[in-house]
Regions:
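Hydrophobic alpha-helical bundle cores within soluble ligand-binding/oligomerization subdomains
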Residues: 2-8, 12-411
């Protein structure tokens, strides 16, 4: 058996070391630990097989029956590792404790720290138009429904949206996300609280502006930090399904609003962005007098899958959930509700050891802060828009219309 070093394997594949590690985390390639326990080796035959399949044929680890089997998209935006997610080389869990969501977005887009002139402000005229359109929706419409409608309205108010320059893409996204948040109805009147990160006290953060539109509670510094941390952790996750949809849109040279609309459409599926709503309903059931164990038992009796546990890319546990739950436990002022969250985790763990995933952690944040069930998808949509645009910008540097998949008769 011929073994290659990490650098040798990456060179043969024509990718960076970080991308090779992402292949490992996605199960596309195996690795052999070196004797020192710190470095890895890769079987040359397996590396060569991937090189061949990139010219056509399936890659191990693809979904069975996938029409895009064998497709690997090189990216510098985000890589997945067993110990966590990295945004352009930065550990996302560290970013969640030390950076605002806005700074994280700027880093994902350009790999640079934002300058003092960069603002995330909304246009009051555009916000008013978005609010008017939003009010036309039926009373039972979900918050993500409002986001999709308002995105189209905000786009129509930007005659320069077809400017393909990266700086124009980024400017449009800043104003869009700010307007989407500011157009949501307030659940807690008053000015947004200050976000505290270390010694910094930040006024007008997107996390604070979103908090007062989702929660009726006044957050303590730790709770608002958990909200910002959730947005940071969710900002990107490599080539999730919605991100692939955005890259396809960008390959047609769609404008930033259309790219985000593409992502929002894919995110609407119950297996993606709205997965946290099912966890929220479980937590509500667990808050009844019978308690968490009874709520889990009732789901099992109905033959339902317990939502919010396990992740195919993280067999040893989702590091995003660990980071977010740590932030939440350190801050939770609503101890009774946090105890219910812990009770669900313990009840599931007694039946079969399973680690919570980021959907569970996101639902826990919303439940503890007394947000509505669709708050998780709303936070997810706003946060993931940052990563979508990072991938759209990267895709704009590639050949256009490169995702032309051939059709064949069904067997």
């Amino acid at each position: 058996m011929s073994l290659l070093t990490t650098s040798e394997a990456a060179a043969r594949l024509g990718v960076k070391n970080e991308t090779l590690y992402a292949y490992v985390s996605r199960g596309l390639i195996g690795r052999v630990r070196s004797d020192d326990g710190r470095s890895s080796r890769f079987e040359s035959d397996e590396v060569d097989a991937i090189v061949r399949t990139r010219r056509g044929g399936p890659v191990a680890g693809d979904q069975p029956g996938s029409p895009i089997a064998g497709m690997v998209i090189a990216t510098d935006v985000t890589t997945l590792h067993p110990d966590g997610v990295r945004f352009r080389g930065r550990n996302a869990a560290v970013c969640a404790r030390t950076m605002t969501f806005e700074s994280t977005a700027e880093w994902l887009w350009s790999g640079l720290e934002p300058g003092p002139s960069v603002t995330w402000a909304s246009d009051p005229t555009v916000v008013a138009a978005a609010v008017r359109a939003s009010r036309l929706l039926p009373s039972g419409a979900l918050l993500p429904d409002h986001l999709r409608v308002m995105t189209a309205v905000i786009a129509a108010h930007d005659p320069m949206r077809f400017d393909p320059r990266p700086e124009a893409f980024m400017a449009a996204t800043r104003s869009l996300l700010a307007a989407l948040v500011d157009a949501l109805p307030l659940r807690r009147p008053g000015a947004p609280p200050k976000l505290r990160l270390g010694e910094q006290a930040i006024t007008g953060s997107l996390a604070a502006r979103l908090w007062i539109r989702l929660s009726p509670l006044r957050p303590d510094p730790g709770a608002l930090g958990a909200m910002n941390g959730a947005m940071v952790m969710l900002a990107d996750h490599e080539l999730a399904t919605s991100t692939f949809g955005v890259r396809v849109a960008a390959s047609t040279r769609a404008d930033p609003y259309a790219c985000i609309s593409a992502g929002l459409g894919v995110l609407a599926g119950p297996l993606h962005g709205s997965a946290s709503a099912a966890v929220h309903h479980l937590l509500v059931a667990a808050s009844q007098p019978e308690g968490p164990t009874a709520a889990v038992a009732a789901m099992l009796r109905r033959g339902d899958r317990i939502p919010g546990f396990g992740h195919p890319l993280y067999p040893d546990g989702d590091p995003r959930a660990v980071a977010l739950l740590d932030l939440l436990r350190a801050s939770a002022s609503n101890r009774r509700r946090m105890a219910i969250v812990d009770g669900i985790e313990a009840a599931v763990g007694r039946r079969k050891p399973a680690a919570p995933n980021v959907d569970f952690a996101l639902a826990a944040l919303g439940f503890v802060a007394m947000m509505p069930p669709d708050a998780g998808e709303t936070i997810f949509a706003i946060a993931r828009s940052a990563g979508w645009i990072a991938h759209a910008l990267e895709e704009m540097s590639e050949a256009p219309l490169r995702y032309r998949i051939r059709a064949q008769p069904r067997p």
